[in-house]
A protein has these predicted regions:
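Short, ordered beta-strand-loop transition motifs
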Residues: 15-21, 53-61, 129, 152
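A cross-taxa feature marking solvent-exposed loop/turn segments within ectodomains of secreted
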Residues: 32-34, 72, 86
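Short, intrinsically disordered N-terminal pre-domain segments
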Residues: 1-36, 43, 47
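Hydrophobic beta-strand core residues of beta-sandwich domains
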Residues: 16, 70-71
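Extracellular/luminal ectodomains and secreted, surface-exposed scaffolds of diverse proteins
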Residues: 36-70
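Non-cytosolic beta-sheet module surface loops
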Residues: 28-31, 43, 68-70, 81, ...
């Protein structure tokens, strides 16, 4: 099965209506394994089987069902896809060629590329036309109590 990743963002956010409790959330992007999904409620990462279960996947969309409380009024529920970077299929050097396995493996690679693109688009970046400037931050002890700022000549200070 070939999936169309181009128009599917690997991230969805829900805001639960005030006075309501919601336990079921659609996953409108394709995923392959239940472990491909991360579920956050108000910024807290939840644990699969402890806090939620997943249906669907195997290259299609699905649903996350909260097993305990779910999202309550005003809560923000964010579901992201984060496929583990690994090769799951090994093709034999001779014999029958499994085109279904090849398509699935290629779909996983495209989905991983979409995950990485989503993560990089959410990162602090320089424009393509900026001169080479380092955005490497100082060590944690040097950063403590500091604010990230930019000066008029060299950029980040």
């Amino acid at each position: 099965m070939t999936i169309n990743i181009a128009d599917n963002s690997p991230r969805i956010s829900y805001t639960v209506a005030q006075g309501q409790t919601q336990t079921s959330f659609a996953v409108p992007f394709e995923f392959f394994d239940n472990a491909d999904l991360n579920v956050y409620i108000d910024g807290t990462l939840k644990t699969i089987t402890t806090h939620y279960t997943v249906s669907g996947g195997d290259g299609s969309t699905g649903t996350v069902s909260m097993s305990v409380t779910g999202g309550t009024g005003g809560s923000t529920v964010v579901i992201t896809r984060d496929i583990e970077l690994e090769r799951t299929t090994d093709f034999p050097v001779s014999g029958a060629f499994n085109i279904v396995a090849l398509n699935t493996e290629l779909d996983r690679l495209v989905a991983i590329a979409a995950d990485l693109e989503d993560q990089s688009n959410r990162a602090l970046q320089l424009t393509d036309f900026d001169a080479a400037v380092s955005l490497v931050l100082p060590d944690v002890d040097t950063r403590k109590g500091k604010t990230l700022a930019f000066n008029a000549s060299t950029g980040a200070v």
